């Protein structure tokens, strides 16, 4: 049985003045799927991420998530609906501990009002306790159980990447968007990341992945969408994408006649 569609992107375009960064791109992500979004440098991958997650407002087209049109919703509203992301450039709070960084991620699900937090109401204290418990569990989940009290800025690069994933998961997402999570990783770290992404999917999350390492993408994704110069040029299974002439030409170029 085919899983229901979680995210539907239809004719999505993003323009900056006279520059078209994304041109009428359409694709779907189904629940429980790991979808790879690939393409050469400047293809529009991160622009697409930014349009989905509310960093950029689309010039045209629509993004529908779990039945809700995102339209002009603000970033925090999109997070509350169930979309979380990491970034190409690590964006942690360096002076905070690993545990504190993940606890911050849980704020997206807190229901205590500002006055309630100021007076430390019973609900606020309960949510604080639950947030710490969840953060501890997520650090263990990403393999950082012994790093919780270390400042984020002092962590090894690979652990900082994992910490970003833990913080994103702390928001309670239905869709996790990973923007080049293997950047700067050595082969063993990449293999561990592939295992982690698979476990994340097995826990019920849906994953949208941007990654330049083609071997990693082919290994971990269920389906791949390929962009070039802001347009979609292919959409299919990894084996199909590997043999697609348009994809090969986009990455390797076409010889002169």
Feature roles, as predicted:
Residues 2-257:
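Glycine-rich phosphate-binding loops of nucleotide-dependent enzymes
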């Amino acid at each position: 049985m085919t899983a229901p569609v979680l995210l539907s992107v239809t004719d999505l375009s993003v323009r900056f003045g006279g520059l078209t960064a994304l041109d009428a791109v359409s694709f779907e992500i189904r629940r429980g799927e790991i979808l790879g979004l690939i393409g050469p440098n400047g293809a529009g991958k991160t622009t697409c991420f930014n349009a989905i997650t509310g960093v950029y407002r689309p010039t045209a087209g629509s993004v529908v998530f779990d039945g809700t049109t995102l339209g002009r919703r603000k970033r925090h509203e999109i997070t509350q609906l169930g979309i979380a992301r990491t970034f190409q450039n690590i964006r942690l709070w360096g002076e905070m501990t690993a545990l504190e960084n993940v606890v911050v991620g849980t704020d997206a699900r807190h229901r205590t009002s500002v006055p309630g937090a100021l007076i430390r109401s019973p609900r606020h204290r309960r949510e604080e306790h639950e947030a710490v418990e969840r953060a501890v569990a997520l650090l263990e989940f990403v393999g950082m159980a012994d790093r919780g009290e270390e400042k984020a800025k002092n962590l090894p690069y690979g652990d900082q990447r994992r910490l970003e994933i833990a913080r994103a998961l702390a928001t309670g997402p239905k869709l996790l968007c990973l923007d080049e999570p293997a950047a700067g990783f050595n082969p063993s770290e990449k293999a561990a990341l592939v295992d982690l992404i698979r476990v994340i999917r097995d826990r019920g999350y849906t994953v949208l992945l941007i990654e330049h390492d083609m071997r990693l993408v082919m290994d971990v994704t269920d389906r791949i969408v390929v962009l070039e110069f802001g347009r979609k040029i292919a959409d299919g299974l990894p084996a199909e994408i590997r043999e697609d002439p348009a994809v090969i030409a986009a990455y390797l170029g076409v010889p002169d006649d």
